[in-house]
């Protein structure tokens, strides 16, 4: 399988009758879908508008509409070119707001209790785990207090942070500031453990996560609640692989996986093992029942 992954995805595309056009030194664009791109340095593709990505095996499966084993057979039978893959490593996340955090979190507590209906008990748990902070954020010449929601990885290293304004600003489309700090690693998600997790519940936002906990806390045991900060299959893949690595005491495995490989790895486990069949309650999606939520659920099924 590893040998198949070395096959040039551009060569495969050409053999399948798709002539991707070069738009930069290492990026190629589908002739009919400008959000469908191949990255020659990593030998991967991503279809941005459909949130589909992967390696050359996933590419063959998508284009030909065949199974994992059939894709491997196709790549093994044909004499394709090999590609020298340069793995792209992300830069470490830098959190610039530590000096302007307010340890009291009084405004954050007020917003979450009075505006979002979250209990003080749950807020305190999140603060104690370091998932919530209050800080000052400067936009142009304006400084305002913001809620900070923090994302930690399997080594409890800070990898991302989302900001939300506490006060309304009617000049903004959503009335409150919402942004993700530059350099955040969005594939990790924000996670909160209850007991010793053996299953995962995914929510769209951290406030959704707290609301879910508020509603279901009496029935939540040995579970990890995860905010995807959107609808991100990469977060589902990372947290699933994390749980499997924890079960097998092999967290060092996750230290070496680059984000673009997370979803293909999860798909490989799905297609080549019985793990998901043996753990039917592993994943729960607690997302909005709108078109986006339904589409996201369909892509994962």
Please state what every model-predicted region is:
Residues 62, 209-218:
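Short active-site loop/helix that positions an aromatic residue
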Residues 78-92:
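Intrinsically disordered, low-complexity linkers and terminal tails enriched in Pro/Gly
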Residues 1-2, 45-54, 216-301:
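TOPRIM fold recognition
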Residues 168, 207-209, 231-234:
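Short, catalytically relevant binding-site loops at active-site mouths
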Residues 196-200, 282-284:
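Short active-site oxyanion
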Residues 1-82:
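N-terminal structured subdomain of primase-like DNA metabolism proteins
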Residues 47, 60, 112, 149, ...:
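Terminal peptide-recognition signature
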Residues 90-194, 218:
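Basic, glycine-enriched DNA-binding surface that flanks or lies within the catalytic cores of DNA
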